[in-house]
């Protein structure tokens, strides 16, 4: 597209939309037009091993003409909603690029408010290098955040499931209650946390009887 006079093309993608704990991260990336051997493994970040993503992240930053990552907290997701957080984050990620693109590609996401033309591509993180690069930046950034968060909240196994709604995770919320980093606006978190509160109330009542 840049060769057709549209200017640099930025890919945008998110990580953590489907999680119930922790932030959502949104990345934007502009890569050179020419193939880059060190980035030959680039594809949808969900199809890459953790070790491959870790290796690719510094290489993407090394070769990118511009890149940015925006992190939106669980508290803001609860306040504004995940859809608003996602769209706002994508606009902010593109605006934060040191080189402004002439065109934006998203992974199937419709994003009103871009200042340049854009195109949602279904399966874009597997077919467009710039989206794949943004996908890796977003996911690896968020995975690192969740691994660090596990040190502060060790009861939930965040370093394993990265805040997604696994059985082990939701059982932990029922047993320990939700942490400040959980998304209380999500029905499964609210329900599990309420079950913990109910059990805690019963324990208090029995203990005081």
UniProtKB/Swiss-Prot annotation:
GO CC list: cytoplasm; ribonuclease H2 complex
Highest taxon, organism lineage: Bacteria
InterPro entries cross-referenced by the UniProt entry: RNase_HII, RNase_HII/HIII, RNase_HII/HIII_dom, RNaseH-like_sf, RNaseH_sf
Gene Ontology BP term (one): DNA replication, removal of RNA primer
E.C. no: 3.1.26.4
Uppermost EC category: hydrolase
Gene Ontology MF terms: manganese ion binding; RNA binding; RNA-DNA hybrid ribonuclease activity
Cofactor comment text: Manganese or magnesium. Binds 1 divalent metal ion per monomer in the absence of substrate. May bind a second metal ion after substrate binding.
Catalytic activity: Endonucleolytic cleavage to 5'-phosphomonoester
Record keywords: Cytoplasm, Endonuclease, Hydrolase, Manganese, Metal-binding, Nuclease
Residue ranges of domain RNase H type-2 in the record: 7-198
Cofactor(s) recorded in Swiss-Prot or TrEMBL: Mn(2+); Mg(2+)
Protein's cellular compartments: Cytoplasm
Binding of a divalent metal cation, residues: 13-14, 107
Name of a matching Pfam family: RNase_HII
Principal localisation: cytoplasm
The family this protein is said to belong to: Belongs to the RNase HII family.
Function: Endonuclease that specifically degrades the RNA of RNA-DNA hybrids.
UniProt xrefs under HAMAP family: RNase_HII_B
Name recorded for this polypeptide: Ribonuclease HII
Originating organism: Corynebacterium glutamicum (strain ATCC 13032 / DSM 20300 / JCM 1318 / BCRC 11384 / CCUG 27702 / LMG 3730 / NBRC 12168 / NCIMB 10025 / NRRL B-2784 / 534)
Organism lineage string: Bacteria, Bacillati, Actinomycetota, Actinomycetes, Mycobacteriales
Name of the encoding gene: rnhB
């Amino acid at each position: 597209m840049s060769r057709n006079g549209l200017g640099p093309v930025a890919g945008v993608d998110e990580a953590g939309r489907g999680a119930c704990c922790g932030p959502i991260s949104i990345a934007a990336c502009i890569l050179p037009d020419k193939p880059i051997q060190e980035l030959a493994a680039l594809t949808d970040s969900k199809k890459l091993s953790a070790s491959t993503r870790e290796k690719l992240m510094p290489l993407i930053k090394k070769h990118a003409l511009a890149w940015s990552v925006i992190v939106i907290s669980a508290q803001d997701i609860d306040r504004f909603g995940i859809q608003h957080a996602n769209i706002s984050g994508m606009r902010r990620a593109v605006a934060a690029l040191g080189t402004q693109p002439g065109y934006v590609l998203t992974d199937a996401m419709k994003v009103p408010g871009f200042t340049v033309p854009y195109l949602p591509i279904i399966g874009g993180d597997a077919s467009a290098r710039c989206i794949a690069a943004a996908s890796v930046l977003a996911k690896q950034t968020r995975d690192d955040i969740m691994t660090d968060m596990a040190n502060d909240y060790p009861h939930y196994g965040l370093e394993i499931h990265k805040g997604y709604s696994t059985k082990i995770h939701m059982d932990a919320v029922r047993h320990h209650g939700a942490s400040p980093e959980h998304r209380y606006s999500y029905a499964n978190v609210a329900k599990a946390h309420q079950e913990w509160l109910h059990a805690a109330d019963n324990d208090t009542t029995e203990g005081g009887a």
